[in-house]
């Protein structure tokens, strides 16, 4: 599992840097479910297509292909297990054009390792029906939170392979924030811009540490059951978040977030209430990282999937997070904003300027979600 955690973690941080190129934008995605979805496609890739995918997904570090798929099998079983105090639903499915004759061995492996089905649709003559079918399936899997994954016109009669990956998470904090302490405060988007935000407050004992080399505080907020943690990296006000992102490698992430190396201390925590819903068309991102052949008919080699000449037509990723006093959840709620002028006190961990956050599965060290809050 460790080699896989390293591969997924490396891919996660590479994605964070690529998706976050424009540092004024919020970022939120699930690297684990993205790795998972792409690993499923990788099972059917051969030759140079497979080599590029392994490179981008950092699988070249982790031994043979078989080990990877078995690793994902255990990871998914562990993360999606029932009886947890959080709700996590990953929805992975590969939709293929039905005239392409997909190999039954490939379909069986999707089911065995990735709890995922390969479904055949008629993109050639029923493109709109196919699009709606995919959207309905995603909406069901994400409790209605992600309703319109594929926008009109995003698939066409030439579409052969659509990889769909959506994820839904809801978890309550181990220690909730008191709603009565939430008040309007200003969030410093940049040196010369501030925006109002609903700032939550809690004084309690948390694990935290300070990384001197990047002038950044790290705070761990556990979810109920302590199987998942939110890890927040907050640079000092004089330090740009870009500096932290530049320095961040998977090795450093592991070193900096080791719970046994942190102090447990009383902290005054101020954290904005926020909701992010981000959608990414992953083709340009993956091409930037070096995975090009998979998208080009004639170059793509998916002979482990089908004898037909195939290429990936679409990779869409959408995820949704809401952080509020109870915890993190994917349910829409509107709050009336109250304008209150309050004397500003100086808390010890005050996330009133851009920060990175990660939701991590403690047992497997898997980074389930990765985000950057830059602006309300």
Swiss-Prot record:
Gene3D superfamilies: Alpha-1-antitrypsin, domain 1 (2.30.39.10), Antithrombin, subunit I, domain 2 (3.30.497.10)
GO cellular component: cytoplasm; extracellular space
UniProt subcellular location: Cytoplasm
Modified sites of kind N6-acetyllysine: 195
Record has 4Fe-4S as a keyword: no
GO MF annotations in UniProt: serine-type endopeptidase inhibitor activity
Origin: domain of life: Eukaryota
SUPFAM superfamilies the UniProt entry points to: Serpins
Any matching Pfam family: Serpin
Keyword Coiled coil: no
Keywords: Acetylation, Cytoplasm, Phosphoprotein, Protease inhibitor, Serine protease inhibitor
Chain positions found as N-acetylmethionine: 1
Site (Reactive bond): 341-342
Modified residues (Phosphoserine): 151
Similarity comment: family membership: Belongs to the serpin family. Ov-serpin subfamily.
Subunit structure: Forms a complex with the monomeric form of beta-tryptase.
Function field: Inhibitor of cathepsin G, kallikrein-8 and thrombin. May play an important role in the inner ear in the protection against leakage of lysosomal content during stress. May be involved in the regulation of serine proteinases present in the brain or extravasated from the blood.
Name recorded for this polypeptide: Serpin B6
Species whose genome carries this gene: Pongo abelii (Sumatran orangutan)
């Amino acid at each position: 599992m460790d080699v896989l955690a390293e591969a997924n973690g490396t891919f996660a941080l590479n994605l964070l840097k690529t998706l976050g190129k424009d540092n004024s934008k919020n970022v939120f995605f699930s690297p684990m479910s993205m790795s998972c979805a792409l690993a499923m496609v990788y099972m059917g890739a051969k030759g140079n297509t497979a080599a590029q995918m392994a490179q981008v997904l950092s699988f070249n570090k982790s031994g043979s292909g078989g080990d990877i798929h078995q690793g994902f099998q255990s990871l998914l079983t562990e993360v999606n297990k029932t009886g947890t105090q959080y709700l996590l639903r990953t929805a992975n499915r590969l939709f293929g054009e039905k005239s392409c004759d997909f190999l039954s061995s490939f379909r069986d492996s999707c089911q065995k390792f990735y709890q995922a089905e390969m479904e055949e649709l008629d993109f050639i003559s029923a493109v709109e029906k196919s699009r709606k079918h995919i959207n309905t399936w995603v909406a069901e899997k994400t409790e209605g939170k992600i309703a319109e994954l594929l926008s009109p016109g995003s698939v066409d009669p030439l579409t052969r392979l659509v990889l769909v990956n959506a994820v839904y998470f809801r978890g309550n904090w181990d220690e909730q924030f008191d709603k009565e302490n939430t008040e309007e405060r200003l969030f410093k988007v940049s040196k010369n811009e501030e925006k109002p935000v609903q700032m939550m407050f809690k004084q309690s004992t948390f694990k935290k540490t300070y990384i001197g080399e990047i002038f950044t505080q790290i705070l761990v907020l556990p979810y109920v059951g302590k199987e998942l943690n939110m890890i927040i990296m907050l640079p000092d006000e004089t330090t740009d978040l870009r500096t932290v992102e530049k320095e961040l490698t998977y090795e450093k992430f592991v070193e900096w977030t080791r719970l046994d190396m942190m102090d447990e201390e009383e902290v005054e925590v101020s954290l904005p209430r926020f909701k992010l819903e981000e959608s990414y068309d992953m083709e340009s991102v993956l091409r930037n990282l070096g995975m090009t052949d998979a998208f080009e008919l004639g170059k793509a080699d998916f002979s482990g999937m089908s004898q037909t000449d195939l290429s990936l037509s679409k990779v869409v990723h959408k995820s949704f997070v809401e952080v509020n006093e109870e915890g993190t959840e994917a349910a829409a709620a509107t709050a009336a904003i109250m304008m209150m002028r309050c004397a500003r006190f100086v808390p010890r961990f005050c996330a009133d300027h851009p920060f990175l956050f990660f939701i991590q599965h403690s047992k497997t060290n898997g980074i389930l979600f990765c985000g950057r809050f830059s602006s309300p």
